[in-house]
Amino acid sequence: MRTGRMLLLSTLTLASCGPLHEEEAALAERADALWVDADADGIDDGFEDQLAAKFAPEVRLAPLSIDWARPANVDWYLARVHMRFDHSGCPDCQVLALATPTQSNLSTQSHATKGTFCGHTSTVYYSNASRKEFFLQPPDDAVHNGAPSSEWKVYVHSKKSALVAGGYDIQYWFFYPYNDSYASVNHESDWEHITVTTDSAGNFYSAWYAAHSGGTRYSASQLRWNGTHPIVYSVDGSHASYPTVGTYPTSVPGFSDHTYDGGPVWQTWNNWVNVGERGAPRNVQNFIKYGGRWGEIGETDATSGVQGPSFQGSWNTY
């Protein structure tokens, strides 16, 4: 039976006046009619959205005096960047002019590589594949500050749980135009996330708070809550996620993560969107089909813009 249909059928059965053996077929038919799965992930879209709204986190950011790199939303950012193609050892090429990237054209671009004497070859790459040669670049540093708080948006991805049999994983992805990290690993663009895992009935089971290349899973008692919304403390600069105020060790000797009270409180349930799946985006969120980088290419991978959520390993795991 399709995920979410049993819960819907149970609800309809409880509302029915007649015996189950007389109305079972009619109830099942009604449940099928109400069951919608536009992104073909095997979960009813309405049930996905119900869980997404219920567990959308409250994100507490560091004070402005400590961290100036604030969140944004995809459309705000696309209106302030151009798309370029990195030719190693040769001049980069512009693919989309400043302010012309959109959700509809981001993943439909193609560009030929360069060979001897930096001439274009017959080898063509496409922006809907995992190609880090494509990258988005702001014209100046002003974009790094992020959008006004009224425009911050969280991007939701739901899937069948990788941890709990019959359960669900609800991912909440946050976008920042800049990662002002420690040492010399600053880079443009930053996609961070947490994942709330539920049981088959949609009850909270645990939450994964991503931090750098890893993360930690927490039980309900280890988290702070605002009603049904888990509270997330975002590290200044790098935006890693932790459950409390404090100092946290990292894998880099001599550098720690710090979280604070006293900064903006981002209640993500006020502005979120379910993006669906890469092969079938929901709510016109076609940006998830773009496989290039979201920021400028630096000297190393660590100082270069990251790829989007659906091209990161955690998309199908945590």
What are these regions (language model features)?
Residues 14-16:
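C-terminal motif of bacterial Sec signal peptides marking the signal peptidase cleavage site
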Residues 18-20:
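Bacterial signal peptide processing site
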Residues 35-192, 202-318:
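A domain-level signal for the mature, folded cores of soluble proteins
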Residues 197-201:
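Short beta-strand micro-motifs enriched in acidic
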